[in-house]
Amino acid sequence: MSSFSYEPYFSTSYKRRYVETPRVHISSVRSGYSTARSAYSSYSAPVSSSLSVRRSYSSSSGSLMPSLENLDLSQVAAISNDLKSIRTQEKAQLQDLNDRFASFIERVHELEQQNKVLEAELLVLRQKHSEPSRFRALYEQEIRDLRLAAEDATNEKQALQGEREGLEETLRNLQARYEEEVLSREDAEGRLMEARKGADEAALARAELEKRIDSLMDEIAFLKKVHEEEIAELQAQIQYAQISVEMDVSSKPDLSAALKDIRAQYEKLAAKNMQNAEEWFKSRFTVLTESAAKNTDAVRAAKDEVSESRRLLKAKTLEIEACRGMNEALEKQLQELEDKQNADISAMQDTINKLENELRSTKSEMARYLKEYQDLLNVKMALDIEIAAYRKLLEGEETRLSFTSVGSITSGYSQSSQVFGRSAYSGLQSSSYLMSARAFPAYYTSHVQEEQSEVEETIEATKAEEAKDEPPSEGEAEEEEKEKEEGEEEEGAEEEEAAKDESEDAKEEEGGEGEEEDTKESEEEEKKEESAGEEQAAKKKD
C-alpha cells in the first residue's frame, strides 16, 4: 500500500511557520512538486502546486483503480483506518488553520481600525495643511499692513527730512545774516573807534583851545594891565605936561589940544584893538563850540548805533540759539523715529522668519506623517496579500480533498469521503473562507493602489507648494530628480511583477479549465454558500 502526504499542497514558508505535524510520504507523488515561492512575493504558488497535485493525483488514481478492486476487506479496513487517522490529523490541522485564519481576520479588523485612525490623522493633517494657508493669508495681510506702516513712516521721515532741510536753509540764512551783522558790527565798532578817536582829538583840541583861551584871557588881562599902566603913565605924563604947560603957559598955549588929540588917538586904537581881540576870541570860541557840538553829535550817534547793534546782535544770538535748540530737538526726534522704525522692522522680520520656520516645520511634519501613512499602507497591502495567499492555500486544500473524495471508487470509501467533505469541512466553506482568491487580492490591491495614489498626490501637492514658497536649491533639485527616477523604476518593477502575475494567472486559468469542468457542481454550491456568507457578513457589518 502506497503512502501519501500533504506536503506538496503547502508552500515552504507556510510549512515552516504553521505546519509542524509529522509527514506521511507518498513516493509516487513527491516527484511532481517543487518548493513554492514566499507568500509575500507572490500568492500564485499554492494554486499552481495544487493544480500539479491534481494532475499527479488524477494520474495516480488511474493506476490505483485496479489495485483497489483486488483489495480484500482487511486491506479496505486498514486503508479506512489510515484514512480516518489522516483525516483526524487533517481536521486538527484545519482547525489550527481556522484558528490562525480567525486571528488573521482579527488582525485585518485591527488593521482596518488602524487604517481608519490613520485616515482620521490624514484628515487632521489635511486640515492642518489647509490651516497654514489660512495663517499664511493672515500673516501676509499683517505683513502688508506692516509694510504700509513702514511706508507711512518712510514718508513721514521724508517729510521730516524736508522740514529739516528747510530749517537748515533757514539756519544758513540766519547764519549769513549773523555774519553780515557781525561784519556790520565790526564796521560800526571801527567807526565808533574812529568817532571815539575823533572825540578824543576834539577833546584835546578843545582843551588846547581852552588853554589858549585862558592864555589869551591872561594876555588880554595883561594887555589891559599894560594898557592901564600906559594910560596911567600917559595920564602922569599928561599931568606932568599940564604942570609943565601951566608953568609954560605963556610959551606953549596949544599943548593941551595936542594931548587931547593924542589921547583920543590912543583911546581909539585901544578900543579898536579891544574890539578886534573880542571878535577874534568870539569867532574862535564859536568855531570851537561848533566843532565840539559836531563831535558830541557824532559820539552820540555812534553810541546809539553801537547800542542798536548790540541789541540786534543779542536778538539774533537768541534767535540762533532757539533755531539750534529746535534743530537739535528735531534731530533727536528723527533719530528716535529711525531707531523705533528699525526696531519695529527687525521685530517684524523676526516674526516673519519665525512664521516661515513654523510653516516649513509643519510641512515637513506633514510630509513625514504622509510617508508613515504610505509605509503603513504598504504593510497593510503585504498583510492582505499574505492573507489572500493563505486563503488560496485553504481553497487548494479543499479542492484537493474534493478531488480525493471523487477519486475513491469504493462505495464505503466514497460515502465516507462524501460525508467528510460535506459535513466535517462545511464550516470552512463559508463566505469568509471561500472568497475568490483571485478577486480578493485584486480588490485590496486596487484599493491600496488608490490610497497610495491619493497619498502620492497629496505629497506631490505639498512638495509643489513648498517649491512655490521656496526656490529649491541645486542639491534639492538633484534629490527630487533621483526620487522621481527611483519612483519610475519602482513603478516599472511593479508593472512587470503585475504583468508576470497576470501571465501566471492566465496560465493557471488555461491549465485549470479542464479540471474546472469536473468541479462545476461543487463550484456552484460554493458560490451559493459564498453568497449566503456574504449576506451574513453584510448583516454583521450593518
UniProtKB/Swiss-Prot annotation:
Domain notes: The extra mass and high charge density that distinguish the neurofilament proteins from all other intermediate filament proteins are due to the tailpiece extensions. This region may form a charged scaffolding structure suitable for interaction with other neuronal components or ions.
Region (Tail, subdomain B (acidic)) residue spans: 445-542
Residue positions where Asymmetric dimethylarginine is found in the record: R23
Modified sites of kind Phosphothreonine: T519
Keywords annotated in UniProt: Acetylation, Cell projection, Coiled coil, Cytoplasm, Cytoskeleton, Glycoprotein, Intermediate filament, Methylation, Phosphoprotein, Ubl conjugation
Region (Disordered) location: 451-542
A Gene Ontology biological process term: response to peptide hormone
UniProt region (Coil 2B), positions on chain: 282-397
Pfam families, per the entry: Filament, Filament_head
Region feature (Coil 2A): 254-272
Protein name as it appears in the record: Neurofilament light polypeptide
Family: Belongs to the intermediate filament family.
The organism of origin for this protein: Rattus norvegicus
Localization terms from the record: Cell projection, Axon; Cytoplasm, Cytoskeleton
Positions of glycan attachment: T21, S27
GO CC terms, sorted: axon; axon cytoplasm; cholinergic synapse; cytoplasm; cytosol; growth cone; intermediate filament; neurofilament
Spans annotated as Linker 2: 273-281
Quaternary structure, from the entry: Forms homodimers (in vitro). Forms heterodimers with NEFH or NEFM; which can further hetero-oligomerize (in vitro). Forms heterodimers with INA (in vitro). Interacts with ARHGEF28. Interacts with TRIM2.
Modified residues annotated as Phosphotyrosine in this record: Y43
The UniProt record lists the keyword tRNA processing: no
Modification sites for Phosphoserine: S56, S67, S103, S453, S473, S503, S522, S531
PROSITE patterns: IF_ROD_1 (PS00226), IF_ROD_2 (PS51842)
Post-translation changes: O-glycosylated; contains three N-acetylglucosamine side chains.
Omega-N-methylarginine: residues bearing it: R23, R30
Modified residues (N-acetylserine): S2
MF (Gene Ontology): identical protein binding; phospholipase binding; protein domain specific binding; protein-containing complex binding; protein-macromolecule adaptor activity; structural constituent of cytoskeleton; structural constituent of postsynaptic intermediate filament cytoskeleton; tubulin binding
Acidic residues compositional bias, start-end: 472-527
